[in-house]
Amino acid sequence: MILGAATVSPDVVAWGVGAAILAGGVGIAVLNPPMRAQDEADDAAAERPPRRQWLGARMIAVLTMAFGTTTLLSGVDLAIVATLREAGQVSWAAVVVVVFGLSSVIGGLIYGALSRPLPTWLLLSLLGLVTIPAGLARDWPWLCVAVVGSGLLTAPTLGTVADAVSRLAPPGVRGEVIGLQSSAQSAGFALGSPLVGVAIDLSVPAGGFATAGLAGLAAALTGYLLSRRSPAVPTPTSRRATSDSR
């Protein structure tokens, strides 16, 4: 979005985003995908657990990391444009963004092939760490190289956030929990750009990458500490297994 606003027109970007949101909403309404598996339908119909039962420290930890992930990604977008603008190479921004996007796709495919998932806080920490040195790049070829690390970890981090939310959410409130996740991520996107923009104004474009990476690290640390302080919460699947064994 930032790239489009800088190279095309803010009005065009606004209309494009609005059209995409509308198309997505219509698509979801038409397809009407199920919010729970068939074996969860009876559980959802039986009871709706109170909010204090599922909105505990672990869920807050995941929502915090969802917020931190999108704060970082939004900041990276702005830092890329700022770096290229300083170098007089804004016309190459599309190439850098394409490299970033392809890296994310490749990272998602590689992570999906792993037999054992990694903790969300670990992936977000790695994403923050590899984002900070991207500010050392001064022109578009090196920036393409610098954003590969962040790109490779983007899809896996977003995927583990969504998976964690799904596992922690009881079937009866899964729609509400997904809404909270969406709100947390939207808030991150909204905060990331102005936060990194202030850092760039006060320093250099490299400060934007550093700020974005540190925001991700802070969210990862917060999520880790919250998860460690909270006792393990049984997932809907484990609860059903326990009930069946009885």
Regions found by a protein language model. Give the residues of each.
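Helix-to-loop junctions at the C-terminal end of transmembrane segments
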Residues: 6, 105-119, 200
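A membrane-interface helix-boundary motif in multi-pass transporters
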Residues: 6-19, 198-217
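Multi-pass alpha-helical transporter architecture, strongest
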Residues: 23-33, 211-246
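Juxtamembrane intracellular "pre-TM" segments in multi-pass secondary transporters
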Residues: 30-71, 241-244
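Helix-loop boundary and gating motifs at the non-cytosolic
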Residues: 52-97
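Intracellular juxtamembrane helix-capping segments at the cytosolic ends
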Residues: 80, 156-169
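C-terminal transmembrane helical hairpin of 12-TM major facilitator-type secondary transporters
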Residues: 120-159
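A late C-terminal transmembrane helix in Major Facilitator Superfamily
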Residues: 173-203
